[in-house]
Every structure is written in structure tokens, then in C-alpha cells.
Amino acid sequence: MVATMEVAPEATSSYGILDAENDGSRLVKAKGMVEKPVAGTAPSNLAVIGRYILTPKVLNNLGKISEGAGGELQLTDAIAKEVEEGRDIYGYRFDGQRYDCGSKAGFLQATVAFALSRADLRDDLSAYLRDIVSAQIAAE
């Protein structure tokens, strides 16, 4: 099982993408997966977002696959091998707020959102953010 969410078609080259029987339901059966497909070649816009429930077989497959995108062993490729071998893999559409902590901006967004959710940090951080945003606007 992999968590997925829809991304813009132009963003598919940044993610592992699920090739699925996409009927719009929250649970979809995978036909395959591809890691960071070249723009315009993705089989869908269902991005794998880094949450997995895996069998030990998938982890064993990591030792049997070739280097993939970026010259690295890709978990996506090991999961795709499961599908190729006839095992069922499902994608579950995530519904909620997600932050891409693989990017600097996403990591900062997650950190700020987390801090603002805490009563012991919210007031001081809110005041600080107001001050620096006001200063930035005034400087423009």
C-alpha cells in the first residue's frame, strides 16, 4: 500500500508516479510505478508521497534492482517489481495537508505550520512573522 495524491501534470517528473486503474475512488489498484518520469510521459498524476505499508519482499527487491532515477536504488522500482511479479499493490489517495520536506521551501512551510499549531509557540512566532512580512512589504 502506498499513499498517493494528485499533482499537476507538470510536477510528475518530481515524484514516483502510480500507474493505476484510476476510477476516482480513494483506493486504486496499481498496474505499475515509475520514478520521476520525463515530463509528458507519466502514466497518471497520482504521486507517491512517501507513506508505505510494505511486505519484506519489497525490501528484498531493493537488492535485486538496478540503479534508477538519479543513479540511486529507488524504492519505487522495488515496489514496481512486485506488480511485475503479479502481486497486488494499492494506492490510497491521501486527503489532508501535506508538506514536501524534500524541498527547502516545503520544509520551512511544515516547520512554520507545526510551530503555529502549538500554543506555546503560536503568539511569539505570529508576531515575528507579521514583523518580517511587514518589513519585506515596506522594502519593496
Stretches found by the model and what they are:
Residues 1-114, 119-140:
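Unchanged
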